[in-house]
């Protein structure tokens, strides 16, 4: 059964992101730029002026919303000057850059997100109901929807890696972090 290994992999990935962020969030960057300032600098470096940066509640709830042209940074990232926060903010700005330059894979990903979100939310419900009712068809549909959500994550890995590459290149080009601090900024890669 592929469901349990896929769930374990997802859990381990989330734990890795959280522990990596925790480790590097305690290390203040020497230049003192916050996550919000880093995102703004990356956008400016690419000539992007129509994207807003907002604070959102939560922890590691950071994302770029292409529908409203807003980078939303969590409390742990927005005002923090750690290399991890700068890296996460730059990664999200990297997604805004992808849209600005017309990066094809991000457009495909955006088209698939609503469908995969619905499937992901329904999958576990259908699996549980299928198990409770001994219904193979419901269970099977739930597993199929979950597998589709996992496959979607795999398909979007190139988009995430590209955003991280853009983020690190921008951080190097804008000198927001010292060279030895870039390792902590690569949380965006773990964020994948």
Regions found by a protein language model. Name each.
Residues 15-119, 151-189:
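Polar-ligand-bearing catalytic/cofactor-coordination segments
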Residues 1-20, 130, 136-143, 149-153, ...:
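Hydrophobic alpha-helical transmembrane segments of small proteolipidic membrane proteins, enriched
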């Amino acid at each position: 059964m592929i469901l349990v290994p896929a769930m374990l992999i997802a859990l381990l990935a989330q734990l890795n992101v959280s522990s990596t962020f925790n480790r590097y969030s305690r290390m203040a960057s020497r230049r003192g730029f916050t996550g919000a300032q880093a995102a703004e600098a990356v956008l400016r470096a690419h000539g992007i002026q129509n994207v807003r940066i907002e604070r959102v509640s939560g922890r590691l709830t950071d994302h770029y919303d292409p529908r409203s042209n807003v980078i939303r940074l969590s409390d742990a990232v927005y005002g923090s000057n750690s290399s991890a926060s700068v890296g996460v903010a730059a990664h999200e700005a990297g997604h805004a850059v992808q849209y600005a330059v017309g990066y094809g894979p991000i457009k495909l990903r955006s088209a698939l997100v609503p469908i995969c979100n619905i499937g992901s939310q329904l999958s576990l419900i259908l699996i549980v109901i299928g198990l409770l009712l001994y219904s193979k068809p419901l269970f099977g549909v739930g597993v199929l929807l979950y597998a589709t959500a996992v496959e979607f994550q795999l398909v979007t890995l190139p988009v995430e890696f590209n955003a991280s590459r853009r983020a690190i290149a921008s951080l190097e080009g804008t000198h927001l972090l010292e060279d030895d601090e870039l390792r902590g900024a690569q949380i965006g890669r773990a964020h994948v």
